A protein has these predicted regions:
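Acidic/polar, glycine-enriched structural segments that form the non-catalytic walls/loops
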Residues: 1-27, 31-326
Length: 326
């Protein structure tokens, strides 16, 4: 079997942010993640959804997939200047074979200093509640200070409709954080656990303010040195409440800690092997002169898999799959 093709975003434009966030979305049928950028943009709609996790925000509102707290967002400041792609060249692609989304940027600050910023992430096909992210920053021609802030952002809404109450947020040791949130009708809980590990000599602290639980990492780098942040996320939800809240949250945290014993590449390899077996059984190949025909078929099958909750016969395919609210 030939390797499934990739989908590439040809250029960066704030007018197509949400188009490509849907086209290049990731998932595994249990969990869907829009392909939003790590940094913020005014027109960007972030989104993370669980199959079957619906809620009605209030009287007269519709029953809809809940937009979960965001775990992708990162604020990157280099020598005090906040990173943004507004005027920069770049490359971003979604690999259908592994489900990995990759982005590489060479960015220059206002003083002309250059930096390579590379990020990649995947939603695991091997362990359904797992998301893995990695970002590397390398100064090309000057010493620099780098600040990376990331965590769990529960200010996310369904276009202004808030479905979740913050039940419990906690930090464990130097690397672990967890937020537990409850739907406003009190029927369902979701636990979002994160592990952030950074290479090299860095300083770290945590803040919890205005529904944001964040880890802040600062590093001093010489030209050519690289700082790497690996972030693992484990997402559980329940609607039966058979276990005590703390016990249930601790069980999720233990699952995340087991994953954290492996590297990003090891976790990706297990997920890629799952995708390989899936494609081997289901891929349709086209013998023809137009490569777009094969890309269209691969794209359709990829999205069919990431939106179909094959793990749970009680869940159906939502109106927008797991790429958006509805």
């Amino acid at each position: 079997m030939t390797r499934p093709v990739t989908l590439t975003e040809p250029h960066f434009s704030q007018h197509t942010l949400n188009k490509y966030a849907s086209l290049m979305a990731q998932g595994n049928g249990y969990l869907g993640l829009r392909a939003s950028h790590e940094e913020d943009y005014t027109r960007q709609t972030r989104g993370m959804y669980l199959a079957g996790f619906y809620h009605r925000a209030g009287k007269g509102e519709i029953n809809e997939l809940v937009n979960l707290p965001d775990v992708v967002g990162m604020e990157i400041a280099i020598n005090g200047e906040v990173f943004s792609l507004s005027h920069e060249a770049w490359q971003r692609e979604l690999d259908f074979a592994s489900g990995e989304l990759r982005r590489n940027v060479v960015w220059r600050t206002s003083n002309g200093s250059g930096y390579t910023i590379a990020s990649r992430r995947f939603v695991s096909a091997d362990q359904l509640p797992l998301i893995a992210l990695e970002i590397t920053i390398t100064p090309l021609d000057a010493d620099t200070s780098v600040l990376i802030s990331t965590g769990i952002d529960a200010t996310q809404t369904n276009h202004g409709r808030q479905h979740l109450d913050e039940t419990q947020v906690r930090v464990f040791g130097q690397h672990l954080m967890q937020g537990i949130y409850t739907t406003q009708d009190g029927r369902s809980d979701v636990a979002i656990s994160c592990c952030c590990m950074v290479s090299g000599d860095v300083q770290q602290c945590y803040t919890a303010k205005e529904r944001r639980l964040q880890q802040h990492t600062s590093a001093q780098l010489h030209a050519g040195e690289t700082v790497t942040l690996q972030k693992l996320v484990w997402i559980d939800w329940r609607d039966d409440r058979q276990a005590v809240l703390d016990e249930w949250g601790s069980a999720s945290l233990r699952q995340l800690e087991m994953c954290a014993q492996q590297s990003y590449d090891q976790l990706l390899a297990a997920s890629t092997e799952n995708w390989r077996q899936w494609w081997q059984k289901r891929r349709i190949t086209v013998n023809g002169g137009d490569a777009h025909d094969q890309q269209a078929l691969d794209y359709a099958l990829y999205h069919l898999r990431i939106m179909t909750p094959a793990h749970d016969e009680r869940s159906s395919i939502a109106a927008k799959g797991l790429t958006g609210e509805g």
